[in-house]
Amino acid sequence: MPDEPGPRTSRRGFLKALGGAAGVAALPIRGEASVGAAPGDDYDVIVIGGGFAGVTAARELRHAGLRTLLLEARNRLGGRTFTAKLGDEHFDLGGMWVHWMQANVWAEIARYGLQIAETPGAIPERVLWWSDGKVREAGVGEILPLLGQAICSNGATPELPLRTLEGLAVLAGLMSDFHEGAAQAFPRPMDPFFSDAWKAFDAVSVKDRLDQMQLSADRRALLEGTLGASCCAPFANSGFIEMLRWWALSGQDVQRYGDAVARFKLRDGTISLLEAMLEDGRPDVRLGASVARVEQGGGAVRVITERGESFRARAAIAALPMNVLANIEFSPPLDPAKVAASRERHAGSGVKLYARVRGEVPSFAAFAPESEPLSMIFTSEAGKEGGVLIAFGTSPEKIDAHSVPAVQQAVRKFLPDLSVTETIAYDWHLDPYSLGTWCILRPGQMTKYLAKLREPEGLVHFAGGDMALGWRGFIDGAIESGNRVAHEVVARLAGRVRPAESAAATAAMALEVAPGDAVFRQCAVCHPSDASGQHGVGPNLRGVPGRKIASAPDYPFSEALRSLDSTWSPEQLDAFLANPAQRAPGTKMAFGGVASASDRAALIELLSKLR
């Protein structure tokens, strides 16, 4: 990295630098899962977005026997996780930590037999914080009433220096007070809509709650350091409800909280889990496929990339960050609530960086108030002669994460003998396919938008860590969401539409035919019949009676149909509808036929009216 700070990187400059700056590169995806798909191919489901939600959904769809295409705009998979390689080392520049309380991701880790490593700074030997222009550590006189709480909170006596226990005890008390009301707001934190008690807190920001506490500057600085790393966003923009949710999910305990959000990681990076899931599901994958438009019509979905490539499917899943959803054109248009949420954006937009340092690196955690460029700095790799630090800040406007001098200044406030030699970071706020870090909803957004973001719209379903119910903003939440939506789509395509989805499904499949005609609706799953004449998975059915078989323009009919060399008379239609495979051996049409002669007659009569 350069030793001198330069001008702010533009979004255009960021795109030019993707994957190649300073020798940092995305680790490759191995296996057949990386094989591309040809434009014009037809699929059962298209998944837009190759983060953990999209990869999870694609795997589940493939396990259900559905032909699945995964489209990713970047030149890598992973979304807001990114295992980057620098020399012989790898760094998780995005999502990183996991825990057994996060049941979805932990089940995947166990399923694939992946190995776990620990972050030393999560159980620090020293706890420091910056207040009133100097470094502080806890004093015994201030701490004795809380010391027992820190020692006993997880049922065991930690083997840590007394001064560290003092610092952790102060933090435990502050965190407990800050999150008062979490149990009432989220009695079942993995099912937030079980109760509406959380609505009483939804208009409150993190800043509002801090102001209510009326803390001393010293105590507020310690608490703000912790919250700054959690929010990765300005406190005035961050919903207090999000921090209550994290606390409730962590069992309302500071030790479990720290373990869940910053201690345990995949030894070989998040890419190791992503690879395992891809090789298990083996969907078709197309990288560099930025989607411009998603069209629905006549029971099919057409996805068009910015390069003009077009793919068709019976359904689609948009597994995208909330902040970028509005940048894709949808026809029919999205629910206004989804568009408004995307344009408002969630608050997460801060900084995560690694700093390689020279000098003796202890296991430590350092905290600073929101006004400082970095909220939290802690040990990733300790060593006598050097190591690696991880740091978080609430805004990229306060620090250039790629500037060695800027990071050096922040680190030396706590440990003046350390020399920063290199920084490694990724500008998530500049990446047009993320436009921010993990999801931290703004005040009021959970009430206004969360339920709407999760609702399907016709044949398009929505997934992502930003709309998870439990660990929203975590890898676990992305996997939760991808699993749920994949199984909804499988149920829909199998004809088992859940009651909550029925209205949306009916609206999507509404055609210019008699309402409630069940036989025709079987056809409408694959065949459009609107006046545009555009095709879906199957050819458009408007004007079929009396037309030469396999003659509709711009549709790739199978040789089985082209060889019939006849017209669609009522007799031909009846024979084909009774048993397509028998009438046209080798047809690609995956439909068993209509057994009832009266149903076939009604369907043929209906088709004759579509002119």
Name each model-derived stretch.
Residues 2-507:
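FAD-dinucleotide binding site
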Residues 18, 320, 545-548, 577, ...:
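Hydrophobic aliphatic residues
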Residues 102, 106, 207, 274, ...:
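Extracytoplasmic/secreted envelope proteins and their assembly/folding machinery
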Residues 247-254, 544, 548-551, 580-584:
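A short secondary-structure junction motif
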Residues 508-532, 541, 603:
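Sequence/structural segment immediately N-terminal to covalent heme-attachment motifs in c-type
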Residues 517, 528-570, 590-593:
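Gly/Gly-Pro-rich "capping" loops immediately C-terminal to redox-active cysteine motifs
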Residues 567-611:
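C-terminal capping alpha-helices of c-type cytochrome domains
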